[in-house]
Amino acid sequence: AALRTARLSQARRLIARHLQDPHLAPAMVADLLGVSVRHLHMLFEAAEKSFSQTVTDERLKQSRRLMREAPERLIADIAASCGFESLATYYRVFNAAYGMAPGDFRARASDGL
């Protein structure tokens, strides 16, 4: 169990390190960890979120942080720097997660809400 927890932590750190890569995939992380893709998926299944959900959540958190810290940056630039391959996908995923468009989030953040 301790080894599983350590590997999951390593996997999460690798995800964080490679978030900006739109091709971040289980095979890449599994290879860096020295485990099979199946084993990697099993690590995440035992946790609360799947690999892909973890990647998406981390990308969204990073994009929100960047919108707060760099309000002058274009949303398209932020989305790309967080690893979203298309702006349409970013808007769809952001809206599904937070119930608002990224621009609305940015406006609220700048109003101090």
Task: Please identify what each model-predicted range represents.
Residues 35, 84, 100:
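Short glycine/serine/threonine/alanine-rich loop segments
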Residues 40, 89-90, 94:
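Short hydrophobic/aromatic patch on the recognition helix
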Residues 38, 87-88, 103:
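Key DNA-contact positions within bacterial/archaeal DNA-binding proteins
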Residues 44-51, 93-105:
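A secondary-structure capping/hinge motif
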Residues 1-24, 30-35, 53-73:
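A short, Lys/Arg-enriched amphipathic alpha-helix from helix-turn-helix/homeodomain DNA-binding modules
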Residues 32, 81-82, 97:
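Residues within the alpha-helical elements of helix-turn-helix
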Residues 27, 45-85, 108-113:
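Terminal helix-turn-helix DNA-binding modules in bacterial transcription factors
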